[in-house]
UniProtKB/Swiss-Prot annotation:
Matching SUPFAM superfamilies: Triosephosphate isomerase (TIM)
One cellular-component annotation, GO: cytosol
Top-level taxonomic group: Bacteria
Disulphide connectivity of cysteines: none
Gene name per UniProt: tpiA
The protein's name in its UniProt record: Triosephosphate isomerase
InterPro entries: Aldolase_TIM, TIM_sf, TrioseP_Isoase_bac/euk, Triosephosphate_isomerase, Triosephosphate_isomerase_AS
Pfam family, one: TIM
Family to which this protein belongs: Belongs to the triosephosphate isomerase family.
Keyword Isomerase found: yes
Catalytic class of the enzyme: isomerase
Species annotation: Pelodictyon phaeoclathratiforme (strain DSM 5477 / BU-1)
One biological process term in Gene Ontology: glycolytic process
């Protein structure tokens, strides 16, 4: 049975002090109620070190929001996998739709970043998902298939990879794919993984849902057989809401 995983992506929110406070509040809100679920939080780069100190003695994992595909060099504004590993990150989010939309990330650069992160010993959350236009024009499966196949190109072992399905039209909009809609895509992704890596690997890979997950809909989403947790945006900025989502995944 796959252990569910819930990660709070704080995006470009919170100062270092605010991140420390939120991490403290998250630990308090979680209490002992998440033993059945893997939990991570992803603050900004600036707050990684300070946040790590707060969660160091807990089971909550430190996650980075991105990393570059080179170790160092003339890449102004970028941060390498080695750098985030050095401050205590165990995982990194790669290919988030906002990176693709606003910063020109492609399947090819996502693939490079994944390979570098894996080579440094990090776990990876690979984000895939379609826009509303792509869904309505009937190319959703083509888009997601390309993101999965090209993102994982040349990667033999996916045991350290989690896939996050994030319908772009549901991110930060308040709209949520129904549990049936989300399950349909998660099953499609798992079928893709079966074709690429075989049945055993596809049964083990965890596929998160990310798209306006809230305490009010988390339990229904997480009850679906192919939804293995969530990549949480806005709701992760409220400790009580995030804890409620984690507990819904811990049942």
């Amino acid at each position: 049975m796959r252990r569910k995983i819930v990660v709070g992506n704080w995006k470009m929110n919170n100062s270092v002090a605010e991140s420390v406070q939120l991490a403290t509040d998250v630990l308090a809100a979680l209490g002992e109620g998440f033993s059945g679920c893997e939990v991570g939080i992803a603050p900004t780069y600036l707050a990684l070190d300070a946040t790590e100190k707060v969660i160091a003695e807990s089971e909550v994992q430190l996650v980075a929001q991105n990393c570059h595909y080179e170790n160092d060099g003339a890449f102004t504004g970028e941060v390498s996998a080695r750098m985030i590993l050095a401050v205590g990150c165990s995982s990194v989010i790669i290919g988030h739709s906002e990176r693709r939309q606003y910063f020109g990330e492609t399947n090819a650069t996502v693939n490079l970043r994944i390979k570098k992160a894996l080579s440094e010993g990090l776990n990876v959350i690979l984000c895939v998902g379609e826009t509303l236009a792509e869904r309505e024009s009937g190319v959703m499966e083509t888009v997601i298939s390309s993101q999965v196949r090209e993102g994982l190109d040349g990667i033999i072992d996916i045991s350290a990879i989690v896939i996050a399905y994030e319908p772009v039209w549901a991110i930060g909009t308040g709209k949520t794919a129904s549990s049936a809609q989300a399950e349909e895509v998660h099953l499609f992704i798992r079928t893709l993984v079966t074709g690429l890596y075989g049945q055993t690997a596809s049964e083990k890979v965890r596929i998160q849902y990310g798209g306006s997950v809230k305490p009010s809909n988390a339990a229904e989403l997480f009850a679906m057989p192919n939804i293995d947790g969530g990549l949480i945006g806005g709701a992760s900025l409220n400790a009580d809401d995030f804890a409620a989502i984690v507990k819904a995944a811990s049942v």
